[in-house]
Structure formats: structure tokens, C-alpha cells
Amino acid sequence: MSKPEYFIGLMSGTSMDGVDAVLVDFSQAKPQLIAGHTQAIPKHLLKGLQRLCNPAADEINRLGRLDRAVGSLFADAVNALLEKTNIPKSQIIAIGSHGQTVRHMPNLEVGFTLQIGDPNTIAVETGIDVIADFRRKDIALGGQGAPLVPAFHQQVFAEKDQIRVILNIGGIANVTYLPGNSEQVLGFDTGPGNTLIDAYILQNLEQAFDEDGQWADSGNSNQALLTQMLSHPYFSLHYPKSTGRELFNQAWLEQQLANFSHLDAEDIQSTLLDLTCHSIANDINKLAPKGQLFVCGGGALNGALMKRLTQLVPGYQLQTTSALGVDAKWVEGIAFAWLAMRHHHNLPANLPAVTGASKSAVLGGRYSAK
């Protein structure tokens, strides 16, 4: 047997529903998940991050403090993950940390993206080298800096002569189109995933998320509101494209609801679920009329979402990535362990056709624990 090649992946998405930490062995043809752990984000830290995502005065001090605090949180996730295994830290080659996105503005004249969670702090508090800051090289090369996971999807999920679409539904939803032949792999953000659904149930019922989509399923979707929301210019943009809370946030939702105050809250929640499903389905149906659709991320656990989506993509067999041997909950964490592995071996990790970068490149920087 070949010697294990252990990397850890750390991911916290726009939904901010926890830090996923995964331990992965890359010594085989396909990555092997050894262990996974989700570290809850403490309420005081979550509030600070949510405030930082909205433009305001005195951001620099808050940014600096939160950068260190998120770094410590990510380190806690790694240490808790390793407590679940018998693998010593000395055997871990590196941690791949996504960080926490607080701004993603790739379409400005000088585009930028900003993830916090100081990798120096993670390295010091875990004793393991950290590879981080994966997105900014792609932006420096004229790309969107996102999505980065399609290169990983291509390596792990592509199958000759089969059209496959990998759909990740986190706060934002993104798709990877794997044509199964010499055609170009494509990938982009379709729009909101769980971000608006989560925000609205938190505001109304003080619940972090709509479990299994039950609240949305108790309401009736409003066609006029859905049509209005789907008229957002982002949905008609051609890829490469990426988005985030900067476009689809509480303020945007309040604007959309201004003329719909007569609607019951559960009807609005049902319409928000439809917004996610319709924006995803519209893009998938444009990519190819039929194929296999594999879903991962938090949205894969939402039964109402999966049911509605199935109805909107009749040409597709819909399953989660677990059917391909990769647990739907941990796909993004594994992807960032993979990105760290690519950096360690000096291999490129972005797909210019996906991000719009001028060339493929080695992504991220290494922060030594020594």
C-alpha cells in the first residue's frame, strides 16, 4: 500500500452555518474521506461576521479582530477533527483553508475578493502548515475567483460519455457541467442557494434554517413575486459569473417584498425556495436537456427543495453525490483539501473557462507552522 497523503480541508460558506473540517487521504486514485467535523460558529462571532458583510464605518478594526477570531475558530475545528482520529499532526502535510468570505466584488474596475480567518493563527494554534488565500490569484489573472470547485469536480466526478452536472447548494448555488467528452467543462454560480431562505426564517421564526423545507412547503408560492425576483439582471448574465451576499441579501429581499406586504410569511418562504429552484433549473436546462444531476451542500438535505428541483429538470436523474461515493455534506471541505494538495505539488487548480482567468495557475500561499 502507498504511504498516506493526508490533507485537511476547512470551509465556511456564505450561509455561515458552521466550519466544516475534513481529513482526506490523497494517496489513492480517488480522495478518501477519513473524518469530518463541523464546528459551530459562536453567536457573538456570527453577529460580528454578519455586520462585517454589510458596508459600514470603522470596518478596519472589526476586520482585524474578526480575522484573528475566525482563525482561532478554524484552528479549533482542526483540533476537534483530529481528536476523532488516531492520526498524529506530524502526518498531516497541510491544511487547506478557504476562510470566511466577507466581500466578493470581482466585477469592479479593480475586482477583489476578501476572505478572513488568519492562516498564521491557524498554523500556530494547530502546529500544521496552512495553505490559504486560494481565490485572489485567479482574480489577479482577470478571473472571477469563483467557483473554484469545478476543477475538483472534474477530477473526481467526470465519467466518459456521460453528461453530469454537479450542483452545490450552499448559501449561493453553483453548478459544474461535466460533458463526458472533449467539450469544455463549465461552472458558475446560478444565484441564491440557502442564503435568502435561511435569512427569512431566522427573521420570522428565529430558526437558523428551514429543516427539510417544511415551512416553505406549508405555504404557496406567489408567481408575481417569483417573476419579479427572477428578473434580476444576474440571472440573464452569461458565464463566467459569480455572486454572493453583495447582490442577494436582506436589503435586496426587503426591496423585492415592498409591494407584497399582503403575503403570508410562509408564502414568501415558499416563493424564496422556488427562486432557488427555478434559477438553478433554468441554467441546468440550458447546459443540456438531459443527463445526471448530483447535488451536494446543505441544500441536498432539504427534501422540499430536492422535490421541487426534480420536477423542474425532467431530463435529469437527480441524486446526491453520496451515490458517487462522496458524502454530500463534505464535498466542499474535501475540495479545499484537494486545493491544498495541488498547491503542495505545484499544480494548477483553476479552470480559466470557468472563472475567466487568463491562464491556469497554482493557487494560494503557504503559511508555515515553524
Swiss-Prot record:
Pathway: Amino-sugar metabolism; 1,6-anhydro-N-acetylmuramate degradation; Cell wall biogenesis; peptidoglycan recycling. One of its GO terms (biological process) is 1,6-anhydro-N-acetyl-beta-muramic acid catabolic process. The keyword ATP-binding applies. GO terms for molecular function: ATP binding; kinase activity; phosphotransferase activity, alcohol group as acceptor. Its EC number is 2.7.1.170. ATP binds at residues 13-20. InterPro entries: Anhydro_N_Ac-Mur_kinase, ATPase_NBD. The keyword Transit peptide does not apply. Keywords: ATP-binding, Carbohydrate metabolism, Kinase, Nucleotide-binding, Transferase. It catalyses: 1,6-anhydro-N-acetyl-beta-muramate + ATP + H2O = N-acetyl-D-muramate 6-phosphate + ADP + H(+). NCBIfam families: PRK09585.1-3, PRK09585.3-2. Catalyzes the specific phosphorylation of 1,6-anhydro-N-acetylmuramic acid (anhMurNAc) with the simultaneous cleavage of the 1,6-anhydro ring, generating MurNAc-6-P. Is required for the utilization of anhMurNAc either imported from the medium or derived from its own cell wall murein, and thus plays a role in cell wall recycling. Belongs to the anhydro-N-acetylmuramic acid kinase family. HAMAP family: AnhMurNAc_kinase. This is Anhydro-N-acetylmuramic acid kinase. The lineage of its organism: Bacteria, Pseudomonadati, Pseudomonadota, Gammaproteobacteria, Alteromonadales.
